[in-house]
Amino acid sequence: MKKAQTWIITCFCLQLLLLNPLVKAQSSCGNPVTDDVNDIAKLVGNLPNDYLITLKYVPKMDSLPNHCWLHLMVPEFSRSLHNLLQKFSDISDMSDVLSNYSIINNLTRIINDLMACLAFDKNKDFIKENGHLYEEDRFIPENFFRLFNSTIEVYKEFADSLDKNDCIMPSTVETPENDSRVAVTKTISFPPVAASSLRNDSIGSNTSSNSNKEALGFISSSSLQGISIALTSLLSLLIGFILGAIYWKKTHPKSRPESNETIQCHGCQEENEISMLQQKEKEHLQV
């Protein structure tokens, strides 16, 4: 009996260890925003002032909660940064390209990690239903990365409650046209750095479709990773219970024959004692 209890406890502990990665995967992902965002000023200084970066964006509206705006903007920033990264990877004859490439690569990693932290599976219908809110424009580096920083700030504000808030648009939605907050006219000063000669951003249909597939693949890969962990843990749990049941069936029936044997032994002893007493009585009568 003690061996069976020990086996059950051992199986239970093993299941807790196997389910631990699943718990970690579902827990908070921490802070994906690193100090690499501080290099944005350097990157903007390196890019030509007239360089244009294409971005599909959603203007901020009073009827659109900030955390929902974040779900709409993050995938588009991932695509635009990926396209920008690809353009720098095609240039290899300038000394400052490696520095720019490294900065853009770090920013791409940040936005991808941020995208992994968002509950896209929970709000994917919201993103599909509000695709009409997007507008496409070409931004100079200063304005593009100002919008990027705005997205980062919104994430920091709602990081602890993103998985608890559902994105539901009210029945009446403002039209994003002529929104005063869309136009980015405020200027900020960046350190003067020699501008790299870089051709303007021209995203073709093939590049756009490839980047869309990669961004969607990134989202699906994170979801598939969680599903695979869950299935592995559940399968291990099932195997553990099956092994425990088999062990129980093998060990438990053995206790019954032993108990029967002990009962029979006790019966034999009683019969022997009775026969001995009867024999002594006979001997006593004969005397």
UniProtKB/Swiss-Prot annotation:
It is found in: Cytoplasm; Cytoplasm, Cytoskeleton; Cell membrane; Cell projection, Lamellipodium. Pfam families: SCF. GO terms for biological process: cell adhesion; positive regulation of cell population proliferation. A soluble form is produced by proteolytic processing of the extracellular domain. This is Kit ligand. GO terms for molecular function: cytokine activity; growth factor activity; stem cell factor receptor binding. Ligand for the receptor-type protein-tyrosine kinase KIT. Plays an essential role in the regulation of cell survival and proliferation, hematopoiesis, stem cell maintenance, gametogenesis, mast cell development, migration and function, and in melanogenesis. KITLG/SCF binding can activate several signaling pathways. Acts synergistically with other cytokines, probably interleukins. It is a single-pass type I membrane protein. Residues 247-287 are cytoplasmic. One of its GO terms (cellular component) is cytoskeleton. Residues 26-225 are extracellular. Homodimer, non-covalently linked. InterPro entries: 4_helix_cytokine-like_core, SCF. Belongs to the SCF family. Gene3D superfamilies: 1.20.1250.10. It comes from the Eukaryota. Glycans are attached at residues 100, 149, 200. The gene is KITLG. Disulfide bonds join 29-117, 68-167. The chain crosses the membrane at residues 226-246.
